[in-house]
Curated annotation (Swiss-Prot):
Residues 52-79 are annotated as: Disordered. It comes from Treponema denticola (strain ATCC 35405 / DSM 14222 / CIP 103919 / JCM 8153 / KCTC 15104). This is Large ribosomal subunit protein uL4. Disulfide bonds: none annotated. GO terms for biological process: translation. The gene is rplD. Belongs to the universal ribosomal protein uL4 family. Gene3D superfamilies: 3.40.1370.10. Pfam families: Ribosomal_L4. One of its GO terms (cellular component) is ribonucleoprotein complex. Residues 58-68 have a biased composition (Polar residues). One of its GO terms (molecular function) is rRNA binding. The lineage of its organism: Bacteria, Pseudomonadati, Spirochaetota, Spirochaetia, Spirochaetales.
Length: 211
């Protein structure tokens, strides 16, 4: 697959051949759905906790006699039917995380990259950094490719200057080529990929190098 490489000013510089085994696969909706759900589940804290009737503080004595009052039968004041009583089948702390097969996870990432490439939502840009670390300098670059849109920038490595410049920009995510996240990648309206990251992606996913 051929893609144009743009300068930070939005001008076309050259073309790059992207590996079809990464950017030209049939889109697998099921595995994408599975990968996004996996990430969201792994992020859940799962600390919600309620007390059952055995855990609520209070007396265990019977509040009134079983018969003769005309009222409902009560064993103690911690009954779930009473205000201040225990909770029936309430939530308890639990771990929502689960593992996903590595092959399925890799297929999900490649499917999302293929989807973005097929829908012209993937832009390859020459390698750049933001020496000043200023937000306004990065905004000027983004306006050429994803003005007002939710965007994802795929970097070759952890460029702290670019990340510092972009941390004030809403709906902007940074991903390293070897640590992609399905949720951010899928929901980003525009995926801006550095030229070096495009080459590394092909190598990382076990395919031939982009030319």
């Amino acid at each position: 697959m051929e893609k144009k490489v743009y300068s930070v000013d939005g001008k076309e510089l050259r073309t790059i051949n992207l590996d079809d085994k990464v950017f030209g696969l049939p889109v697998n909706d099921d595995v994408i759905y599975y990968a996004i759900n996996n990430e969201l589940a792994n992020k859940r804290v799962g600390t919600a906790c309620t007390k059952g009737r055995a855990e609520v503080h209070g007396s265990n004595s019977k509040p009134y006699s079983q018969k003769g009052t005309g009222r409902a039968r009560r064993g103690d004041k911690k009954s779930p039917l009473l205000v201040g009583g225990g909770t029936i089948f309430g939530p308890k702390p639990r771990d929502f995380s689960y593992s996903m097969p590595k092959k399925a996870k890799r297929l999900a990432m490649k499917s999302i990259l293929s989807l973005k490439a097929q829908n012209d939502r993937l832009v390859v840009v020459e390698d750049f950094t933001v020496e000043s670390g200023k937000t306004r300098d990065l905004v000027k670059i983004l306006d050429n490719f994803a003005k007002g849109e939710r965007a994802v920038i795929i970097l070759k490595d952890d460029d702290s200057l670019v990340k510092r410049a972009g941390r004030n920009i809403p709906h902007l995510s940074f991903l390293a080529y070897n640590r992609l996240r399905a949720h951010d990648l899928f929901y980003g309206r525009k995926v801006i990929m550095l030229e070096s990251a495009a080459k590394n992606l092909s190598e990382f996913y076990g395919c031939k190098e982009a030319e």
